[in-house]
UniProtKB/Swiss-Prot annotation:
Keywords: Mitochondrion, Ribonucleoprotein, Ribosomal protein. This is Small ribosomal subunit protein uS10m. GO terms for molecular function: structural constituent of ribosome. It comes from Prototheca wickerhamii. Its main location: mitochondrion. GO terms for biological process: translation. It is found in: Mitochondrion.
Length: 107
């Protein structure tokens, strides 16, 4: 049995939702029912910048970058379906989403 873990990262949750729905459609066409989605905690990075270069040091701007993360775990029993799924994932070009794929093999 093979197990694939997809880690998805994005700055916009809409892009992750689009990719998840696309992957669920691919899994439905390949007739795979052994998948689960895990919501991971989002990270917030805050940056503070001084507005003025010379005076008024108390005047500051604050920005934040929020990174959303999800994980999908999919179990495969047939190696040919696994190869087909990995080829489809390789050809996916979703803007704004970073995909990390790890494959585990259980004998």
């Amino acid at each position: 049995m093979q197990q694939v873990q997809l880690k998805l990262k994005s700055f916009d949750p809409v892009y992750i939702n689009q990719l998840i729905s696309l992957l669920n459609d691919v899994l439905d066409t390949l007739e795979i029912q052994n998948s689960k989605e895990i919501f991971l905690p989002s990270k917030i990075k805050k940056i503070t910048v001084i507005r003025s270069p010379h005076i008024h040091k108390k005047s500051r701007d604050q920005f934040q970058i929020k990174r959303y993360k999800r994980s999908m775990i999919i179990s495969f029993t047939n190696i040919d379906i696994l190869h087909a799924f990995l080829e489809i994932c390789k050809d996916l070009h979703v803007v704004g989403v970073q995909i990390h794929i790890s494959v585990k093999y259980h004998s």
